[in-house]
Amino acid sequence: RNDILKEFLIKPELNGHNRIDIRHVILNLDSLSPFDIIGFTEKELGPSVFDRMIAIARIRNEMDENRLNIPIHIFGSLDPITTPLYYLSGADIFDGLAWLRFIFARNSTLYIESSGPSIEGIHVNMDQIWAMSIAKNYNFIRRLSMDFEKYQSTGDYQCLGPNHEFYRKSYEDLLVNIGGEIDGK
C-alpha cells in the first residue's frame, strides 16, 4: 500500500543479545530502502549515551553517503537531555514515556512524586500535579521541536536553550570520535 508509512525496527540479531551490531546494519543498508523510517531502541544502540550518539552518527553518515534519505527513529528517548544529543547525532524522530512519568523542569528530568510538590506546592493534589506536569511537558516537547527547527536553519547552539554549551561540547566530542561532520546537521 502506498497510503501508509512503513517503519522497520532494527533489533539485536541474536537471542539474548542486548546490543545492535551497527556494522551489520551499515553492511545491509540497501535492504532498508523499502522502508520509510528505520527505528532503534535507545538502549540497544550502546551502553552509554556517547556510544549511542556514535552509533546514530555512523548510521546517519552511511545512509547519507548511500543516498538513503530515511528518518531515524529512536524509541525510548524523549527527554530534555538525550533527545537533543541524539538529534545532533543524526536522529529525526523520538518517542518515549518519560514525559508521562517525570517533570521536565529546570533543564532536567525530575521525578514527579518528589519534585512535583516542591514545584507546585505541598497542598496540591498529586493527580493535579501529574496533570499539570503532563501539560507543561507537552509544551516543553513542542518548544524543543521548534528549537530543533531554529537550530537546523541557523546552526546556532543557543537555539537549544540553557544547556546549549553542554550540547555543543558533546557534539564536538562526537565529531572528534567519528572523524568529521554529520551530514545534514
What kind of feature is each model-predicted range?
Residues 1-69:
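Conserved alpha/beta-domain cores
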Residues 11, 40-42, 73-77, 95-97:
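Short His-Asn-centered micro-motif
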